[in-house]
Amino acid sequence: METQTQYLTPSLSDSHQQPPLVWELIRWLQAVAHQWQTITRAPTEWVIPREIGIAIPHGWATESSPPAPEPGPCPPTTTTSTNKFPANQEPRTTITTLATAPLGGILTSTDSTATFHHVTGKDSSTTTGDSDPRDSTSSSLTFKSKRSRRMTVRRRLPITLPARFRCLLTRSTSSRTSSARRIKDASRRSQQTSSWCHSMDTSP
C-alpha cells in the first residue's frame, strides 16, 4: 500500500504569517528528494557496457534483452492463399491485392486469365473457377477483342478555339466572302459593259 507524503509548501496567501525558517525548507527538500527516489527507484550508479555502448543503471541485465530487429524492407501487404488440389495437379497460389481490382468489377483469377463479373450477371464472357479452361480461354479472347475494339474506336472531339482566335477566324472568313463578292460583282459589271459596248457596235 502506497503512502502519500504531504508536501510542506510555504503558504503565500496569509500575509500576516512569518516566512518559514531555513531548516524547515531543508527538511522539506530532503523529504521530496527521498520520495522522488523511492517512486522512480533512480539508481545511484551508472555503467557503460562494451556491447551496448550507452550508460545503463548498474544491475540491469544486458543478456536478457531481446535483439533489435534487422533493418529491411517492409513486409508485403498482400494476402497469399494456397488451395488444395489432387495429386495430379500442382498447387496454385493466388495473390490478391486491393490495388489491382478495377472499378465496377470483381477480379476473379482463372486458369487462363482474369475476367470481371458484372453486377447484372448477363455478360456471356464472364467465367468462374469451376468452368472448362477452353471456355474460359475463348471467353477471355472475346473479352480482349472487345476491349481492343473499344480502344481502337476513338471519337473525334470538335476543335474549340479561344474567343480572340474565333474572332480572327470569323473576320478572315467574312473578308474572304466579301472579297469574293466584290470580284463577282466586278466581273458582272465588266461583262455587262462589254455586252453593252458590243450591242452598240452592232447596232445600225
Swiss-Prot record:
Biased composition (Low complexity): 123-140
Keywords: Host nucleus
Comp. bias (Polar residues): 189-204
Top-level taxonomic group: Viruses
Subcellular localization, as worded in the UniProt entry: Host nucleus, Host nucleolus
Listed GO CC annotations: host cell nucleolus
Compositional bias ranges of the Pro residues kind: 66-76
Region (Disordered): 59-90, 118-150, 172-204
Further comment found in the protein's record: The protein AAP uses an unusual ACG start codon.
Function: Plays a role in capsid assembly. Promotes the transport of unassembled capsid proteins into the host nucleolus for capsid assembly.
Protein name in the entry: Assembly activating protein AAP
